[in-house]
Amino acid sequence: MTNAIDELQAIIAELKTEVEEQRAVIRQSRDRIEHMSAEVRMNIVKNYERIRDKTVAIVGVGGVGSVTADMLTRCGIGKLILFDYDKVELANMNRLFFTPDQAGLSKVEAAARTLTFINPDVRIETHNYNITTIDNFDNFLNTITGDGTVAGEPVDLVLSCVDNFEARMAINAACNEKCLNWFESGVSENAVSGHIQFLRPGDTACFACAPPLVVAENIDEKTLKREGVCAASLPTTMGITAGFLVQNALKYLLNFGEVSDYLGYNALNDFFPKMTLKPNPQCDDRNCLLRQKEFQARPKPVVVQEEAPTDEPLHASNDWGIELVAEDAPSNAPTDLSQSTDVGQGLRLAYEAPEKSSAEATQAATAPVDDTSLEDLMAQMKSM
């Protein structure tokens, strides 16, 4: 028995050594490979390596949150902070992230293991608790304001991937208090629609500015759940929503493109509504009202007038003699290209419109006008 244990320990030690060697190779290859090289070469994203200096907090590691964490890890994010208090169940296997062997583990622990395997350079910090309780809310608040890439600095972005309004209100209260930008996301109960929303305290509406009826009426969500009925879950809708969320998060973190304030998705007719929600001056969140005053007091950005483009040609050389003309400009192209000296020999039109003869033109111009009515013509035809 002792020999068998020793052999297993030796095998485990050998596997650990092999894994460490593979991780070292991954680190070396990652330094040589530039993330999103196509976007960098095409001048879409400048200095993409800044992604390694960013910290993102993800609240909720379920259907949307787990895929979001996976995408950010593959993009090379510097640090991820995960919040969730639930465990992996076999019912979660229709998601895109968890596997059956992880059943029973906390979602943050299972996610950390998988994400570390995908990209060992990403720092993963996990918190297995419910942020809506008083003590845990204080811990959550301290974490997002002091556990950034630099110790004592806030995170760069908070992503809400929770499935209940109570947690959304807690995130909203924390971000309003600390003036942190955050994204809210969600999938409908029937799993055929989803949305993302970018919330900037004071600039756009917070989650309490136009709350759902459940929140406005202080209704306990637990009383609304029907026994034996759970929310539908489609990995397609969750994957699409997570893709929108990460895409806009990257645009915000790396400062490229246009970040959507609100982007919806309806799978039944592929409808993508976009809008911007203004803050409510009578919001119930006092920190939201404070942020609105601060935003209004900020100096307005100076709009720089762009110089009108000149009419000079973009390229000095024009070896092929290509010219642009207005659509309504008369065409001077000859009907018979063989007689033209401006084009290569052997070219001809695929279709040459026949020219009207002088006789046809004269007949059309001198055609008699007949004032006979339709009734008279019908009477003449009947008498024939």
Curated annotation (Swiss-Prot):
Residues annotated for ATP binding in this entry: G63, D84, K107, N130, N164
Positions of region (Disordered): 352-375
Pfam families per record: ThiF (PF00899)
Binding site for Zn(2+): C206, C209, C283, C288
InterPro entries with a match to the protein in the record: D-isomer_DH_CS1 (IPR029752), ThiF/MoeB/HesA (IPR045886), ThiF_NAD_FAD-bd (IPR000594), Ubiquitin-activating_enz (IPR035985)
Active site: C230
Keywords: ATP-binding, Metal-binding, Nucleotide-binding, Ubl conjugation pathway, Zinc
Coiled-coil portions: none
One BP term from GO: protein ufmylation
GO function terms (MF aspect): ATP binding; metal ion binding; UFM1 activating enzyme activity
GO cellular component assignments: cytosol
Superkingdom as given in the UniProt entry: Eukaryota
Family per similarity comment: Belongs to the ubiquitin-activating E1 family. UBA5 subfamily.
The protein's role, per its UniProt record: E1-like enzyme which activates UFM1.
Protein name: Ubiquitin-like modifier-activating enzyme 5
Organism (species): Drosophila persimilis
Source taxonomy: Eukaryota, Metazoa, Ecdysozoa, Arthropoda, Hexapoda
